[in-house]
């Protein structure tokens, strides 16, 4: 790659910005090597004991490539992200995609079937996720809504089902969780049991350590489910009690890649690509 510096523009600059973002640096992915990018490059150089000149030359590129080489990258999307250029995901370094499938007892994502078909046709690993609701939303009814999306979990390349457990759309709904904590924890447990039984897969739990503590009280009994933790920070994320480590880490809610217009959530897998393929049943 050519040396990049202030004033450079184009695809190579986007790749640089994406890689820095992957390492937890706050940077806009726009293909423009402006003051913001130069400042982040300088910080990266400082953090890695390189000459601090704000120029992405051979030594900086080598250090950056060495750090990102082993990271298995993914994104998570819904209809809110709009059209996705699926054919360029691989060139963006994306190995897997989480796709919103359903929410509560009645909503199914209008983009899900398009995402599902396109990704499986291209042999890109994917996982469907269900956004969990708590009030007037029985576990069986939520599971049935998720099943209506007709995901074939026996197909190679399909990761386990995911339940998204986080803040709700209003203060009143969030307060409901606090006021009915025991019942809400049971609701989650029931959904996981139903989905595991129906699919034959151990579901993945997506959550945030603060939400898990503040709203659910750090409940026990969930450590057997792989953890997808949301933590927008540079350092490794905090892990809720009951888990030894994370399986996936959503490290940015305002990421950027060429395949998606606008911002997109970015993720990294805590393991090798072979480990991820095993989780997705590839080669089994």
Place the predicted regions along the sequence by residue:
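Substrate-binding cleft of extracellular glycoside hydrolase catalytic domains
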Residues: 70-92, 96-198
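Acidic, Ser/Thr/Pro/Gly-enriched interdomain connector segments
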Residues: 1-31, 69-83
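Conserved hydrophobic/aromatic packing and binding residues within compact polymer-binding modules
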Residues: 41-44
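Glycine-rich, charge-decorated loop segments at or immediately adjacent to ligand/cofactor-binding or catalytic sites
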Residues: 138-141, 213-221
